Amino acid sequence: MNIKTIEGNLSAKDSKFAIVTSRFNDFIGGRLVEGALDCIVRHDGSEENIAIYKCPGAFEVPMVAKKLAQSGKWDAVIAIGVLIRGATAHFDYIAAEATKGIAQASLECGVPISFGVLTTDTIEQAIERAGTKAGNKGWDAASAAIEMVNLYKQM
């Protein structure tokens, strides 16, 4: 069989990335942003080609991500936020809407929007995913964005 397989590579050279992050739970979200920045720079990205947009909470992240994707200025958008389950159903509603909103924005805009929104049951789980035991999900979201930019370039 002679089937061609096309994949994106992990070179951020000359690509432009917007990071949208929520200020709510920023003591963890800031670590995710640091992970995303580190990933882009380590993969030959330039700090001049990165901008960080801060919004109030995870519910607003999809709106900002969509606006950034529609602007035509960015090769990819990295969506970052931190949701930690509390005593009410509020977590479930915000987590579901943020997830759906980010996916919908990416599909509608044709620009990769990677998902770096933590949805955890405890603060300890969030901390683990922000650079301790379970890696840094901001890094993972940036890595996915880089790969998708390069895959899109081959389409």
UniProtKB/Swiss-Prot annotation:
Substrates-to-products reaction catalysed: (2S)-2-hydroxy-3-oxobutyl phosphate + 5-amino-6-(D-ribitylamino)uracil = 6,7-dimethyl-8-(1-D-ribityl)lumazine + phosphate + 2 H2O + H(+)
InterPro entries given in the database record: LS, LS/RS, LS/RS_sf
Disulfide bonds: none
Top EC category: transferase
EC number: 2.5.1.78
The entry's keywords: Riboflavin biosynthesis, Transferase
Any single biological process term in GO: riboflavin biosynthetic process
Residues the entry annotates as binding 5-amino-6-(D-ribitylamino)uracil: 24, 58-60, 82-84, 115
Binding site for (2S)-2-hydroxy-3-oxobutyl phosphate: 87-88, 129
Pathway this chain belongs to: Cofactor biosynthesis; riboflavin biosynthesis; riboflavin from 2-hydroxy-3-oxobutyl phosphate and 5-amino-6-(D-ribitylamino)uracil: step 1/2
Gene3D superfamilies: Lumazine/riboflavin synthase (3.40.50.960)
Active site: 90 (proton donor)
Annotated Gene Ontology cellular component terms: cytosol; riboflavin synthase complex
Function as written in the Swiss-Prot or TrEMBL entry: Catalyzes the formation of 6,7-dimethyl-8-ribityllumazine by condensation of 5-amino-6-(D-ribitylamino)uracil with 3,4-dihydroxy-2-butanone 4-phosphate. This is the penultimate step in the biosynthesis of riboflavin.
Family: Belongs to the DMRL synthase family.
Protein name, entry field: 6,7-dimethyl-8-ribityllumazine synthase
Species per Swiss-Prot/TrEMBL record: Chloroherpeton thalassium (strain ATCC 35110 / GB-78)
Classification lineage: Bacteria, Pseudomonadati, Chlorobiota, Chlorobiia, Chlorobiales
